[in-house]
A protein has these predicted regions:
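C-terminal helical/coil "lid" or tail adjacent to the Rossmann-like core of SAM-dependent
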Residues: 189-243
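A short acidic, Gly/Pro-enriched loop at the edge of an enzyme's catalytic core
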Residues: 95-106
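Conserved class I S-adenosyl-L-methionine
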Residues: 1-46, 57-61, 78-81, 136-159
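Class I SAM-dependent methyltransferase SAM/SAH-binding core
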Residues: 49, 54-97
Length: 263
């Protein structure tokens, strides 16, 4: 039976994570992070906040560059993995950052689309940065995983639910996010959408179980398994080739902005 989703506009709507599933099905995220890491260009001695650090893979790379880095996330499971790597991390709600001019840069990779209160996020980042500090990030932009999001809406509608409540991600346009950054005192140096067809190293079921757990949690068994199978069937004609290889259509929003002095 379909259970009601919490309001998708509530900022603290939570995606539950499995550290083992993330390591198996989500490693492509870090593998594709080279361009955004280069845009951050961390320097020795800089104080950097990694917003949505997950299991700390990129946090460790920032630290290896000589920066003093703090990672924050809301997943106990992923933070436990990061702590095992000896990293400085803490559990925190990115919608309620309480730092004031403590960081030279704030970095975020593949996390901001999970945070449904972007105005709160950007405002908190602006306060956390020193004047001239950098906000560098990459996350899902407009059109990201469009086929998957459409299939989710179709499944919910077919079961009598509200398709408008089926998808919790925040995938803004360049214009929308650029305006948000400017409104919080940032000078935007770069902001682009980057289409990225990404072959999966796992099957679609594994990807959906890892990254759409919030969606399947609204169903009880055996319907949950039925919905997963229905999603795969809907997506197969568009995203799976004749050899059984799956590809997802990522669209990333990549940006670099600087907190203006005096803001």
């Amino acid at each position: 039976m379909l259970q009601p989703l919490t309001d998708p506009l509530v900022p603290d709507a939570v995606q539950r994570w499995s550290a083992s599933d993330f390591a198996k099905n989500g490693r492509f995220i870090q593998d594709l992070a080279g361009p955004i890491f280069a845009l951050l260009a961390p320097k020795p001695g800089e104080r950097i906040l990694d917003l949505g650090c997950g299991d700390g893979t990129l946090t460790a790379e920032i630290e290896a560059a000589g920066a003093d880095v703090l990672g924050i996330d809301n997943s106990d499971e992923l933070l436990a993995v990061a702590r095992m790597k000896g990293l400085s991390v803490k559990k925190a709600d990115a919608h309620a950052l309480d730092y004031v001019q403590e960081f030279d840069a704030v970095f975020s990779n593949a996390a901001l689309h999970w945070m449904r209160g972007p105005d709160l996020i950007v405002g908190g980042v602006a306060r956390a940065l020193r004047p001239g500090g950098r906000f560098v990030g990459e996350f899902g932009g407009h059109g990201n995983i469009a086929a998957i999001a459409t299939a989710m809406r179709a499944v919910v509608k077919g079961r009598g639910g509200n398709p408008a409540r089926a998808v919790r991600w925040y995938f803004p346009t360049v214009e929308e996010y650029g305006t948000l950054l400017s409104g919080h005192g940032f000078a935007v140096h770069e902001i682009v959408l980057v289409p990225r067809l990404t072959p999966l190293k796992v099957d679609m079921q594994g990807w959906l179980r890892t990254f759409c757990r919030f969606f399947f949690d609204q169903f009880e068994e055996p319907e949950r398994s039925e919905v997963l199978a229905e999603m795969v069937d809907l997506l197969k004609p568009s995203l799976c080739d004749s050899q059984g290889r799956w590809t997802i259509e990522l669209v990333r929003l990549r940006f670099s902005a600087e907190r203006r002095s005096g803001e």
